[in-house]
């Protein structure tokens, strides 16, 4: 568990980006501070992308936002699920499923904690707000680099429908359907469906298949209930699924190990990270599905507004990947990830007081994550690969069979097909946050903003390693004794070791011991639990120069769990 706090000082002259075409300045309403304000009033570096701009720029998913948002970067890693957002160069990406991103993403106020819940195509949006810099005061943990806040279009009491289709290169086909209208005087609804298919831009020379393709679809139902003049309830259910071959891996350098791959008669990726070819002995499978339901309640009172956002989400993914990334049948990785999350947020916000406006809130988040990941020796090519490297490293002195004989390990048990390591992990996360912010109007043009939040984040994890890789469990340092050398090799080697233990040539084989047996946890030395808490804050001054220009400066902190 890592906890990082950092601050940013901002001084921005009209520092907001609005992607909308108009002949005159348009008043843009945003919820970057969890209350509706004009863009000019918000002392945050924020880019606002309207629904029209989403269509014009052909923004399909959150990753496409980098085309129109300054300082936002997206990166794809080993599988569809392993991707990351970066804002101003800050972010993180990892194949570790327990790692949470540093850029928080919200859809209609609901936090999507892991990348596998973020990769679906966008629904019908009202606008998208990208906030730069730490936003933990109002948005909670893991908003240290910034926030992507997606607001979808509410159902309308006027009938409206939309069909769209687009075709592109790599046989890209995108189809979307949306319809909204009233059920009665108090209930409006909307339904949407979309599908996105495209051939991959990388060709697998072994199977003939495509890699980095697209095969996704999603469904969404939305109901808006105006239960009373002062009470609005919105219920949203969504489902999305992807079934793809991902991802292409390119080499940035070619090391000695690559020559061993060629010696096996196999193909490997060239020294070109931009190659459009891969040489996997099977197509890498990446599948997943996400579903959820959200209830958003807004109650208007005399001097304040009460908001409740309740959500339950589930996410499952499966990956089957050739992790030697060449045509030799050596290693594969199989990963299953299951996530279940529930969240509840309550907010009270004042209404339009001339002197000051305030916001108070509480947030509760609970997530269960199960992750099973296996690295398996896929076939005899792994043993043959190790033999080539062993003979080369010892100038032909011994291969893996000779090492096994000296260690007393039957040759047939070293890197046998089917051996490997399977890690079975669980993680429970409970997060509680209380937050508040007040805007004090010092004059008609000068406003002070003060905010603070308390965040408590508790995690409980378990881990078990089912390991059948015998070679990784051998202590090669201890095995390299004079007695061992005398028993297994020539006297000259024994004499050299006696004079200088550093010449123990067995130590070079530790590179093959990349699957050491993990100690199960919790255990005596590791509780498998962590509990962090932090107080975040923001303090800013904003000055309205005129109707089109504002100046602000301040400091904000962030919390990373």
How does the language model describe each region?
Residues 83, 100-102, 114, 123-126, ...:
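Outer-membrane beta-barrel translocator/receptor signature
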Residues 154, 182-185, 225-231, 300-303, ...:
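Outer-membrane beta-barrel strand-turn architecture
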Residues 224-228, 348-351, 363-365, 429-561:
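Structural signature of Gram-negative outer-membrane beta-barrels, strongest in the C-terminal barrel
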Residues 163-167, 191-197, 235-239, 310-312, ...:
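Transmembrane beta-barrel strands of outer-membrane/channel proteins
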Residues 149, 156-158, 166, 177-282, ...:
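Periplasmic-side early beta-strands and strand-to-turn transitions of outer-membrane beta-barrels
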């Amino acid at each position: 568990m890592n906890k990082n706090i950092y601050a940013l000082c901002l001084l921005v002259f009209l520092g907001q980006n609005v992607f909308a075409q108009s002949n005159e300045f348009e008043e843009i309403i945003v919820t970057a501070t969890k209350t509706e304000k004009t863009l000019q009033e918000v002392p945050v570096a924020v880019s606002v992308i309207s629904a029209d701009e989403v269509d014009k720029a052909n923004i399909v998913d959150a990753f496409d936002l980098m085309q129109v948002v300054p300082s936002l970067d997206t990166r794809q890693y080993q599988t569809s699920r392993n991707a990351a957002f970066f804002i101003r160069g800050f972010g993180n990406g990892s194949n570790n499923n327990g790692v949470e991103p540093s850029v928080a993403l919200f859809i209609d106020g609901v936090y999507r904690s892991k990348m596998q819940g973020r990769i679906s195509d966008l629904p019908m949006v009202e606008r998208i707000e990208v906030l730069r810099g730490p936003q933990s005061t109002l948005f909670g943990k893991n908003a240290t680099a910034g926030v992507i806040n997606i607001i979808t279009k509410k159902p309308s009491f006027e009938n409206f429908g939309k069909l769209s289709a687009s075709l592109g290169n790599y046989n890209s086909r995108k189809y979307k359907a949306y319809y909204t209208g009233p059920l009665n005087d108090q209930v409006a609804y909307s339904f949407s469906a979309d599908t996105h298919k495209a051939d991959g831009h990388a060709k697998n020379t072994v199977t003939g298949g495509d890699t980095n393709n697209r095969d996704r679809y999603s469904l969404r139902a939305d109901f808006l209930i105006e239960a009373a003049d002062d009470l609005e309830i919105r219920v949203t259910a969504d489902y999305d699924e992807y079934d793809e071959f991902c991802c292409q891996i390119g080499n940035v350098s070619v090391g000695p190990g690559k020559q061993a791959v060629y010696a096996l008669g196999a193909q490997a990726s060239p020294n070109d990270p931009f190659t459009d070819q891969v040489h996997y002995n099977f197509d890498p499978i990446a599948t997943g599905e996400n579903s959820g339901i959200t209830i958003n309640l807004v109650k208007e009172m005399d001097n304040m507004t009460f908001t409740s956002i309740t959500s339950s989400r589930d996410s499952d993914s499966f990956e089957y990947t050739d992790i030697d990334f060449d045509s030799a049948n050596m290693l594969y990785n199989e990963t299953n990830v299951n996530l279940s999350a529930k969240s509840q947020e309550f907010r009270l916000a004042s209404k339009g007081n001339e002197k000051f406006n305030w916001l108070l809130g509480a947030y509760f988040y609970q997530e269960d994550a199960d992750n099973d990941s296996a690295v398996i020796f896929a076939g005899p090519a792994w043993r043959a690969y190790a033999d080539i490297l062993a003979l080369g490293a010892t100038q032909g002195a011994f291969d893996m069979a000779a090492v096994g004989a000296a260690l007393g390990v039957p040759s047939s048990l070293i890197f046998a097909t089917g051996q490997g390591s399977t890690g079975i992990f669980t993680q429970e996360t409970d997060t509680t946050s209380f937050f508040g912010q007040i805007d004090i109007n010092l004059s008609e043009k000068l406003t002070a903003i003060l905010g603070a939040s308390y965040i408590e984040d508790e995690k409980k994890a378990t881990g078990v390693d089912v390991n059948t890789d015998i070679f990784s469990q051998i202590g090669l340092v201890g095995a390299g004794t004079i007695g061992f050398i005398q028993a297994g090799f020539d006297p000259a080697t024994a004499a050299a070791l006696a004079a200088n233990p550093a010449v123990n040539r067995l130590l070079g084989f530790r590179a093959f011991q990349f699957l050491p047996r993990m100690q199960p946890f919790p255990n005596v030395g590791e509780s498998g639990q962590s509990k962090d808490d932090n107080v975040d804050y923001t303090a800013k001054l904003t000055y309205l120069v005129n109707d089109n220009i504002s100046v602000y400066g301040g400091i904000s902190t962030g919390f990373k769990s």
